[in-house]
């Protein structure tokens, strides 16, 4: 496994907390949280792309 595919200890802890948060949710609440999480991940991707595009390291 590549090191970039591994989670840090902090990320592992965050994952455990997230699992605890979703455990009591019903199906509708779980679906809503999943949609919110996906939206957040897509926004994060956009921010990363923007930073890379506008950095001094882009070619």
Swiss-Prot record:
Any Gene Ontology CC annotation: chloroplast
Superkingdom, taxonomy of origin: Eukaryota
Record keywords: Chloroplast, Plastid
Gene3D superfamilies: Phycobilisome degradation protein NblA
Matches recorded under Pfam families: NblA
InterPro entries linked to this entry: NblA, NblA_sf
Compartments (UniProt record): Plastid, Chloroplast
Family recorded in the similarity comment: Belongs to the ycf18/nblA family.
Protein name (record): Uncharacterized protein ycf18
Annotated source species: Pyropia yezoensis
């Amino acid at each position: 496994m590549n090191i970039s595919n591994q989670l840090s200890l902090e990320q592992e802890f965050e994952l455990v907390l997230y699992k605890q948060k979703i455990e009591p949710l019903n199906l509708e609440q779980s679906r809503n949280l999943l949609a919110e999480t996906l939206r957040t991940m897509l926004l994060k991707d956009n921010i990363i792309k923007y930073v890379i595009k506008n950095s001094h390291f882009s070619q």
